[in-house]
Amino acid sequence: MGLSFIPRRTLAAGAMVVAGVLGLAACGGGESTTASPSEGASSSAAAGGAKLVTPGKLTTCTNLPYEPFQFKEGGKVVGFDVDIVDLAAKKLGVTQEIVDIDFAVIKSGAAMAAGKCDVAAAGMTITEERKANIDFSVPYFDATQALLAKKGTGVTSLEDVKAKNLKLGAQASTTGLDHAKKNGFDPREFADSPKELLGLQSGQVDVIIQDLPVVLTWLKKPEVAEKFELVASLDTGEQYGVGLKKGADPVVLKAVNDAITEAKADGTYEQIYVKWFGKKPGELG
């Protein structure tokens, strides 16, 4: 299924206006994006009567990069989440368009409330706090947190990190950050996952907490695997969901839910999973 991509800088001015109206100026580290005023102001009906912010497009808010869930490769946005949402777009008879925006604006529900996108797929964990502002699809991914540290650090748990008085880093606005705080840490926060990894590589922190698939993807890179290692997997019982505007369009919600459910039943989900993670569901760790 084809898709198009709206980079952050292309529509930065419009995003700043929306952010100002919503009081979101302090939300995140990167520039946010939005549809043009004419697109955001009115919805258009797609197959089955779905109301979409842009004619012929299922517009997805995400935060790049978050490999292997969503990242740019050869000028295109690809990834596990992209393939999942493509299934829903196909059901609606449209193509997917991707908008790169700060994760804090996504998880607050403000991006969809402002008409920036129809759905959000950004490796986003379903939480009760987020449910207050976002409607979620059925779960599409079982998530686990992980700790990445310099080789020889000698830690295998958050307890070890605390006992050794090591500096912990986490990505801002994430459940990894929340989990660390619940365990008594005050982590150094980084705006996105690449900055978090750079913080570890540059010695700003000694250990970082991040979703396991992201850590495993980093470790495929020789420059990371040479000096750093996965020291712990933390079973936090998290599940990702596709986010929708509160009081979501029932046609869009049904398309997303049906796409996920049917893909799991007919083997498509497993094919996508193996494509991006190299293992079948339940084998990742």
What residues fall within each predicted segment?
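Acidic, polar ligand-binding/catalytic clefts
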Residues: 97-160
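Extracytoplasmic small-molecule ligand-binding "clamshell" domains
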Residues: 40, 45-122
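Periplasmic-binding protein-like
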Residues: 141-149, 212, 216, 220-258, ...
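Extended ligand-binding regions for polar small-molecule ligands
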Residues: 28, 82-91, 174, 241-279
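Sec-dependent bacterial lipoprotein signal peptides
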Residues: 1-25
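Short loop->beta-strand "edge-of-pocket" segments that line small-molecule binding or catalytic clefts
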Residues: 59-62, 158-173
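Bacterial lipoprotein signal-peptidase II cleavage site
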Residues: 24-41
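Short helix-initiation/N-cap motifs at beta->coil->alpha
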Residues: 98-110, 155-156, 172-174, 188-202, ...
